[in-house]
């Protein structure tokens, strides 16, 4: 099977054996994004949290993949939460687009899948938003942390979930467990 990594390796070998006058239109340049992704995906796979798995539906499209987070602690323990990650052409100047595909009761993720994670913000006033120095590894570790140390009830996207937690923590836990049983198995 031809993957983007093997294609890049093959193209580099072909490029090295050609002179500029023999380069044809059939040998297309690989985008900066795709070159970065080859390195970043290798780094990500070597440093993946034990609670996460990545899946590339098409191994030739490293710019589109799924992440499964299976927290082993917190309110969300026992759930399997799917995220869709799409890396735009302008990467690494802009962050990846991320959506939660699993319905969840969470203060930082809406029931429709929008996510509040500062490093996914293109423009941030506090300096914690996206920067070209960030990588896919940062994104995956950040998403994983939304279920533990980055779980933030004080700056919610899903205000109803945060207020629910403030009102009655036991009831909140019950609703989270119900959502896990119904949507995250």
Curated annotation (Swiss-Prot):
GO terms for molecular function: ATP binding; NEDD8 conjugating enzyme activity; NEDD8 ligase activity. InterPro entries: UBQ-conjugat_E2_core, UBQ-conjugating_AS, UBQ-conjugating_enzyme/RWD. It is an enzyme of class 2 (transferase). Residues 1-29 are annotated as: Disordered. This is NEDD8-conjugating enzyme UBE2F. It comes from Xenopus tropicalis (Western clawed frog). The active site is at residue 116. Keywords: ATP-binding, Nucleotide-binding, Transferase, Ubl conjugation pathway. The lineage of its organism: Eukaryota, Metazoa, Chordata, Craniata, Vertebrata. The keyword Repressor does not apply. It catalyses: [E1 NEDD8-activating enzyme]-S-[NEDD8 protein]-yl-L-cysteine + [E2 NEDD8-conjugating enzyme]-L-cysteine = [E1 NEDD8-activating enzyme]-L-cysteine + [E2 NEDD8-conjugating enzyme]-S-[NEDD8-protein]-yl-L-cysteine. Accepts the ubiquitin-like protein NEDD8 from the UBA3-NAE1 E1 complex and catalyzes its covalent attachment to other proteins. Together with the E3 ubiquitin ligase rnf7/rbx2, specifically neddylates cullin-5 (cul5). Does not neddylate cul1, cul2, cul3, cul4a or cul4b. Pathway: Protein modification; protein neddylation. Belongs to the ubiquitin-conjugating enzyme family. UBE2F subfamily. Its EC number is 2.3.2.34. Residues 1-29 are annotated as: Interaction with uba3. The gene is ube2f. It comes from the Eukaryota. One of its GO terms (biological process) is protein neddylation. Gene3D superfamilies: Ubiquitin Conjugating Enzyme. Residues 32-185 form the UBC core domain.
């Amino acid at each position: 099977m031809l993957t983007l990594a093997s294609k890049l390796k093959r193209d580099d070998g072909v490029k090295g054996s050609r002179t500029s006058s023999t380069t044809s239109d059939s040998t297309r340049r690989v985008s900066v994004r795709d070159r970065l992704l080859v390195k970043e995906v290798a780094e990500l796979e070597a440093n993946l949290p034990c609670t996460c798995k990545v899946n590339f539906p098409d191994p030739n499209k490293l710019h589109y993949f799924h992440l499964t987070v299976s927290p082993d602690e917190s309110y969300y323990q026992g759930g399997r939460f799917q995220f869709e990650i799409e890396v735009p052409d302008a990467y690494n100047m802009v962050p990846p687009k991320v959506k939660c595909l699993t319905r969840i009761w969470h203060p930082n993720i809406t029931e429709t899948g929008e996510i509040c994670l500062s490093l996914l913000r293109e423009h941030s006033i506090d300096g914690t938003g996206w920067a070209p120095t960030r990588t896919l590894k940062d994104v995956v570790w950040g998403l994983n942390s939304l279920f533990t140390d980055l779980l933030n009830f004080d700056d919610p996207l899903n205000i109803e979930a945060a207020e629910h937690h403030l009102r009655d923590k036991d009831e909140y836990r019950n609703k989270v467990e119900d959502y896990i049983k119904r949507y995250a198995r």
